[in-house]
Design a protein with these regions (language model features):
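Helix-to-coil/beta transition segments that act as allosteric "coupling" elements at the rims
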Residues: 118-144
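Short, basic, alpha-helical segments at the C-terminal edge of helix-turn-helix-like DNA-binding modules
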Residues: 243-254
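Recognition helix of helix-turn-helix DNA-binding domains
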Residues: 212-245
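Juxtadomain coupling helices with adjacent low-complexity linkers
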Residues: 2-25, 35, 145-197
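The N-cap/first-turn positions of alpha helices
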Residues: 199-203, 213
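Signal-transducing coiled-coil linker helices
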Residues: 28-41
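GAF sensory/regulatory domain recognition
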Residues: 58-82
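Regulatory sensory and allosteric helical modules in signal-transduction proteins
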Residues: 73-116, 122-125
Length: 256
């Protein structure tokens, strides 16, 4: 990489207004009303940071067989199309890194990749990710729920300059705010689609504390068999086999 290209990013992050400009965009994410608004702010934040492209990925795994992926794309939409058509979510080395790590890392610092993982990275390089910074967003649900922000540049080694420490700090702030926003979206959607009530949440909290039906019934001044029936209905709402599985879904999606 030509030294002047490093200076472009180094000079940008040393600008006196750099942090304020980036933070101004980050602060707006909380009030984004939908994905379109979140994408608009991600594009703006990406530009203010000094990157060319960005992808934010949210991953939720309900159990061993069921997983869902959500994306905010601030890059060429053709990349998103190719990613989906090729099923690259199953071989994405950037997401794999985020599942087990919390520190930002440059893509070129990742351990040796498999052939399919290299295919994903080579595909991304054509759409503004010749170099990339991977910023994980950990969650209390560990590998069952994680997000990752990937920032890209068409210039190789773009994120290896002296100014990258401050860049990384701002990128982590952006990633965390996007993670909080996406978490609220997913939680609210499940609450609405499953028609979860405050009484349902109260049952789940009792289950979380290890209370059996008899203890819950005593606390709610009702019968144990009534509690059993309510848990059966709640489990059906959440697509869970039993109350323990229902609690797991609730914890993964942040209902309680």
């Amino acid at each position: 990489m030509h030294p002047a290209e490093h200076r472009d990013l180094d000079q940008r992050v040393r600008d006196a207004s750099y942090v304020a400009r980036v933070c101004d965009v980050i602060e707006q994410i909380e009030s984004a009303v939908d994905s379109a608004e979140a994408v608009r702010l991600l594009k703006l934040a990406t530009a203010q940071l000094g990157a060319e492209a960005a992808v934010f990925t949210s991953y939720v795994r309900d159990d061993i067989t069921l997983a869902s992926y959500r994306y905010l794309l601030a890059c060429d939409p053709i990349w998103g199309l190719q990613y989906a058509q090729n099923g690259w979510c199953l071989d994405d080395p950037w997401l794999r890194y985020a599942l087990y790590n919390a520190q930002p890392i440059r893509a070129d610092q990742l351990p040796e990749l498999s052939a399919r993982e290299r295919w994903v990275v080579e595909g991304a390089a054509h759409f503004g990710f010749a170099s990339a910074l991977i910023v994980p967003v950990p969650s209390p649900a560990a590998q069952s729920r994680v997000s990752v922000l990937c920032l890209g540049s068409s210039q190789p080694d773009y994120f290896a300059g002296d100014g990258c420490h401050r860049f990384n700090l701002m990128a982590r702030g952006l990633a965390m705010e996007l993670g909080d926003w996406m978490h609220r979206q997913v939680r609210n959607e499940l609450m609405a689609e499953a028609r979860i009530t405050d009484d349902d949440l109260m049952l789940l909290r009792h289950q979380q504390q290890g209370h059996n039906s008899k203890v819950i019934a005593s606390a709610l001044n009702t019968e144990a068999k009534t509690i059993d029936c309510r848990f059966q209905r709640l489990s059906l709402k959440l697509g869970a086999a039993n109350r323990r599985a229902a609690l797991r879904v609730a914890e993964i999606y942040g209902l309680i």
